[in-house]
Amino acid sequence: MAEKRNFQAIKGTRDLLPPETELWNRVEQTAREVFGSFGFGEIRLPIFEPTELFARAVGGETDIVSKEMYTFPEAPDSEEMKPLGSTTADLIIRRAASTRVSLRPEATASVCRAYIEHGMHALAQPVKLYYMGPMFRRERPQKGRYRQFYQIGAEVLEAITPNTDATKTIGKDAAVDAEVIEMVMAYFARLGLEGVQLDINSIGHSAPPIGGKPECRRGYVEKLKNELEKVKDKLGADSQRRIETNPLRVLDSKLESEQEIIAGLPRIGDHLCADCAKHYAEVKRQLELRGVAYRENRRLVRGLDYYMRTTFEITARGLGSQNAVCGGGRYDGLVELLGGAPTKGIGFAIGEDRVILSLQEAGKGSAAQGRDVYIAWMGEKTLATAIRAARDLRQAGFRVELPPVEQKFGKALGQADKLGARYALILGEDEVASGEWTVKTLADGTQGKVREEGLVAYLKR
């Protein structure tokens, strides 16, 4: 006999149950409505992708790729297993081992891959897409942070000709950035999320903008690295490693012991080239035109290598140290890095888990949604009428509970109360024979008579 075992969800994952899923549905449906009003369409992406996609897009030296991704070899399919001339079993094994896939840790790279694969550069530009779904990172689980977590995000991608003069598109790029930020702030407002704070910054660019001048970030990074070397012994292990791999990431440290050191480091805002400074000034002007309140945070950087110029982060109160609910920025050049045509891009990702938590902390979670109508039928001759009534009410949009077997009157009302029903439709043989049905309002105990053809109107009154 097999050993009895109680299975549980893996650490860092959890089940989402009613009534909490009612809130999740509202958060996601609100995104569809708000993003749709800005002209965005939904894209649905694979859960796993080639590991190389994330290594190239996110950066091979980032924590996400080097330590946090769930990666595994892709087994050869039946065609690969067929003998191919002198191909040996060892070669097949090596081929399988060299093809590695990863559960997606983020979705921007996947959206860019889809943009290239489906020739979206030939569509009317820009292409506006949004997505939602689970992501996966092997992180230490804590409040608001899981190994399987959920994101809602949006991307704006625009293919352009290689000879475009970047100095002439600065205003347009800034307007797109501002509209994307306006959209996500409108989304949080529609949700009723409280204590929302928008921080913005510009991090210049590490590669020439499409049709633009050489990078302005390199000189700053070198200066930052030199300053970090002077205080290296006072930094934690992760920050010491980042001095060599990506010095900008040190500015993103959340360690309390490092904050004073970070405050004394050079600021990238003091090293922007003329074009990046002009772009940043125009982003701020556009936000002000749209009535979007913001705070400049000159230490703000993003944790992914592909970002340039505009970066932003949105926080919400009541979440402690894990209070960021959204992050995003501009990433011109990422599509080209992945093999596509020169393309500009900006996007963001919302941490849905943290948004849900923030709403719950503010008392805006979903209460259990009961049934609208409980049908208490008594007597075999009433069953057909009860089934017809349930069908008609459901088609009219009511949540209906029809018990599979008849119940005594008192038990039926007790069950209706447990399910949170608003009304009990009482169908006995007398009601069916007379054509007048009894409807009991459970909140106050009042009841009335109604004919079948008037039932829906009576309940909607």
For each of these PLM feature ranges, what is it?
Residues M1-R461:
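TRNA-recognition modules of translation machinery and tRNA-sensing kinases, especially anticodon-binding
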